[in-house]
Amino acid sequence: SVVKSEDFSLPAYMDRRDHPLPEVAHVKHLSASQKALKEKEKASWSSLSMDEKVELYRIKFKESFAEMNRGSNEWKTVVGGAMFFIGFTALVIMWQKHYVYGPLPQSFDKEWVAKQTKRMLDMKVNPIQGLASKWDYEKNEWKK
């Protein structure tokens, strides 16, 4: 069996808001009832019912402007996927904190930082512009 490929040199149908009138009709191969309706279209349009007018519109166009402008639900999939990956990342981080990383070193403890600061003040580290310059040694408190 031979498969006939699409001829891409011919115009193709597309519903686009920026190009509202496509060069070809939506339905390429008309059925017998659609052919009869196209013949009836050549007469007065006042003799056509509303359903026949809609059917003629659907032969030419796949979607109306309202249908083209209707929002899609794709954002729900994107938000759901993003939330899945954020949740997975949070689980990996919690696993790492529990099983991979050890306890924090003692130098992160507030008491240790206070002792280290006191030691630096006692040694008068950087007395011109640094930490020791902001400490009042006579009153034993930070300068105001």
UniProtKB/Swiss-Prot annotation:
Residues with the N6-succinyllysine modification: 4, 35
Organism, as annotated: Pan troglodytes (Chimpanzee)
Transmembrane portions of the chain: 74-99
Description of how the protein assembles with itself and partners: Component of the cytochrome c oxidase (complex IV, CIV), a multisubunit enzyme composed of 14 subunits. The complex is composed of a catalytic core of 3 subunits MT-CO1, MT-CO2 and MT-CO3, encoded in the mitochondrial DNA, and 11 supernumerary subunits COX4I, COX5A, COX5B, COX6A, COX6B, COX6C, COX7A, COX7B, COX7C, COX8 and NDUFA4, which are encoded in the nuclear genome.
Alphabetical list of SUPFAM superfamilies matching this protein: Mitochondrial cytochrome c oxidase subunit IV
Full protein name: Cytochrome c oxidase subunit 4 isoform 1, mitochondrial
Topological domain ranges for the Mitochondrial intermembrane compartment: 100-144
Residues recorded as bearing N6-acetyllysine in the entry: 4, 28, 35, 42
Swiss-Prot/TrEMBL GO biological process terms: mitochondrial electron transport, cytochrome c to oxygen
Function according to Swiss-Prot or TrEMBL: Component of the cytochrome c oxidase, the last enzyme in the mitochondrial electron transport chain which drives oxidative phosphorylation. The respiratory chain contains 3 multisubunit complexes succinate dehydrogenase (complex II, CII), ubiquinol-cytochrome c oxidoreductase (cytochrome b-c1 complex, complex III, CIII) and cytochrome c oxidase (complex IV, CIV), that cooperate to transfer electrons derived from NADH and succinate to molecular oxygen, creating an electrochemical gradient over the inner membrane that drives transmembrane transport and the ATP synthase.
Membrane topology type: Single-pass membrane protein
InterPro entries found in the cross-reference section: Cyt_c_oxidase_su4, Cyt_c_oxidase_su4_fam, Cyt_c_oxidase_su4_sf
